[in-house]
């Protein structure tokens, strides 16, 4: 599944902090600053998704939804939450 692959790349970049990596840039500072940066991006992407939806722009909705999901995955990985834990929560809600 592509989301799991992306999640593993995010985890790797948080750990290894390769030069030029956007994820590394978001997560390199002290924990409080890193969390603030990540949460600001989630807020920004949420707003952009809402605006795209209100404007009924399908392409923008898809683009902004992908951005929101990506930054949420960065937050989860930064907080050491495994992707499988998220999937288990969806499974629990399915019942």
Curated annotation (Swiss-Prot):
Q: Which CDD domains match?
A: NTP-PPase_HisIE_like
The signal peptide here is: none
- Which InterPro entries is this protein grouped with? HisE, PRib-ATP_PPHydrolase-like
- Show the stretches that span the lipid bilayer: none
| Enzyme Commission number, as recorded | 3.6.1.31
Query: Where mainly located?
Result: cytoplasm
Arranged from A to Z, the UniProt key words for this protein are:
Amino-acid biosynthesis, ATP-binding, Cytoplasm, Histidine biosynthesis, Hydrolase, Nucleotide-binding
Gene3D superfamilies assigned to the protein according to its UniProt record, in alphabetical order: MazG-like
Q: What catalytic activity is recorded?
A: 1-(5-phospho-beta-D-ribosyl)-ATP + H2O = 1-(5-phospho-beta-D-ribosyl)-5'-AMP + diphosphate + H(+)
- Pathway stated in the Swiss-Prot or TrEMBL entry: Amino-acid biosynthesis; L-histidine biosynthesis; L-histidine from 5-phospho-alpha-D-ribose 1-diphosphate: step 2/9
NCBIfam families according to UniProt: histidine_hisI, PRK00400.1-3
- What PANTHER family would the database entry show? HISTIDINE BIOSYNTHESIS BIFUNCTIONAL PROTEIN, HISTIDINE BIOSYNTHESIS BIFUNCTIONAL PROTEIN HIS7
Query: By what name is this protein known?
Result: Phosphoribosyl-ATP pyrophosphatase
Q: What species is given as this protein's source?
A: Methanocaldococcus jannaschii (strain ATCC 43067 / DSM 2661 / JAL-1 / JCM 10045 / NBRC 100440)
């Amino acid at each position: 599944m592509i989301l799991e692959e992306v999640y593993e790349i995010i985890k790797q970049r948080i750990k290894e902090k390769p030069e030029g990596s956007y994820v590394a840039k978001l997560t390199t500072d002290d924990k409080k600053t890193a969390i603030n940066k990540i949460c600001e991006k989630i807020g920004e992407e949420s707003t952009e998704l809402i605006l795209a939806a209100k404007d009924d722009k399908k392409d923008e909705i898809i683009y902004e939804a992908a951005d929101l999901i990506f930054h949420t995955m960065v937050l989860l990985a930064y907080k050491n939450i495994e992707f499988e834990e998220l999937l288990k929560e969806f499974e629990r809600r399915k019942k």
